[in-house]
């Protein structure tokens, strides 16, 4: 099932947290009732993945909940922003993260690794993104780095980026 923040099922096409239940789903965390309680809506296990069901019942994974950017009360899937950033020929690698913003809660920030010799400005990124994303999803800031932090299996560590760039 795909559920809202209150644990209510969402209709087809609506994005929410993917929840599971069944005989093979964990009963909880070993000797950690607080974490177990936070991980369930009743008997539905909260996966931490964001997705949606289409009209035919097919499930689409769109993001991780902890990677969701919340700006001005709007949920923004970082993966959606990244797909658009990767369309730019100057971009070798990209990550979209939310950084603290006094007015909006979080601001969409693009962290990019440019191809050798490439140049890219915030204005160029915004112009590219505005036609493909809603205005509130368009990056408000671009930070160029030499490399994105990764775990041993190659996954980008967005938590590390948020910590380092929030200072």
Predicted regions and their residues:
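Structured core elements
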Residues: 1-2, 19, 60, 95
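A structural signal for short hydrophobic beta-strand segments in well-ordered beta-sheet cores
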Residues: 2, 49-53, 96
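Carbohydrate-binding surfaces of carbohydrate-active enzymes
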Residues: 5
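Conserved ATP-binding/catalytic segment of the ANL
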Residues: 8-13, 17-79, 84-87, 103-104
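Residues at the N-termini of beta-strands
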Residues: 17, 90-93, 141
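Conserved C-terminal "lid"/linker of ANL adenylate-forming enzymes
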Residues: 69, 95-101, 106-116, 122-167
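Generic non-transmembrane alpha-helical segments
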Residues: 84-90, 128, 132
């Amino acid at each position: 099932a795909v559920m809202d923040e209150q644990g209510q099922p969402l209709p087809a096409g609506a994005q929410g947290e993917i929840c599971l239940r069944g005989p093979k789903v964990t009963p909880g965390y070993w000797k950690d009732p607080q974490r177990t309680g936070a991980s369930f809506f009743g008997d539905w296990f909260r996966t931490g993945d964001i997705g949606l069901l289409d009209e035919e019942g097919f499930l689409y994974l769109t993001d991780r909940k902890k990677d969701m950017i919340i700006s001005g009360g709007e949920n923004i899937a970082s993966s959606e922003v990244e797909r658009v950033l990767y369309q730019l020929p100057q971009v070798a690698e990209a990550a979209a993260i939310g950084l603290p913003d006094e007015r909006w809660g979080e601001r969409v920030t693009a962290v990019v690794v440019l191809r050798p010799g490439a140049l890219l400005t915030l204005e160029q990124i915004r112009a590219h993104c505005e036609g493909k994303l809603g205005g509130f999803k368009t990056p408000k800031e671009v930070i160029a780095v030499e490399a994105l932090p990764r775990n041993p299996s190659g996954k980008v560590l967005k938590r590390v980026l948020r910590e380092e760039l929030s200072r």
